[in-house]
Swiss-Prot record:
This is Zingipain-1. Pfam families: Peptidase_C1. Keywords: Disulfide bond, Glycoprotein, Hydrolase, Protease, Thiol protease. Glycans are attached at residues 95, 156. The lineage of its organism: Eukaryota, Viridiplantae, Streptophyta, Embryophyta, Tracheophyta. SUPFAM superfamilies: Cysteine proteinases. InterPro entries: Papain-like_cys_pep_sf, Pept_asp_AS, Peptidase_C1A, Peptidase_C1A_C, Peptidase_C1A_papain-like. The active site is at residues 27, 161, 181. It comes from Zingiber officinale.
Amino acid sequence: DVLPDSIDWREKGAVVPVKNQGGCGSCWAFDAIAAVEGINQIVTGDLISLSEQQLVDCSTRNHGCEGGWPYRAFQYIINNGGINSEEHYPYTGTNGTCDTKENAHVVSIDSYRNVPSNDEKSLQKAVANQPVSVTMDAAGRDFQLYRNGIFTGSCNISANHYRTVGGRETENDKDYWTVKNSWGKNWGESGYIRVERNIAESSGKCGIAISPSYPIKEXXX
């Protein structure tokens, strides 16, 4: 397969502005929602900010502010028939009761797929088509204090933070992933981090290639 030399889904209008999860451990919801916002824009042309809070409150196979998994968020959206907009089910940053009155199916997806583990080439193929959910180790000081540039600092390969890969490019012969975080716009490069790509470890930098997944949305005939 011929892959584009670089891709940045922000430039293609498939990424809403960076959000902030606050003190709630809901990165899994922000990660899943960013991927759904992306594929919805790619398929329909509409960029709609969707509700992380609905996932926190209603995705019972996840644990709200105590953590969760993007693939289970995708399962919830599929089983629920869709997800509401952020406007109508806004983020509070706390565990709430599922508000069934605010269950408008603003955006739906058809299924989801896991990218083969520990294979940056497969992740590259997936990101060529849409933003992809990944897990990374964000517990380290280097990561938390990241300001700018291509991140080459120390980190483990444990899965403790989810975020969304929105592109891949090369600068001065260094390959990197463009990763959207959910710690607000003041962190990193306006809320993003560039992470070195094609490294020796198959798990990728900070474990980025361990368990990527993405939602699937068919174009309505």
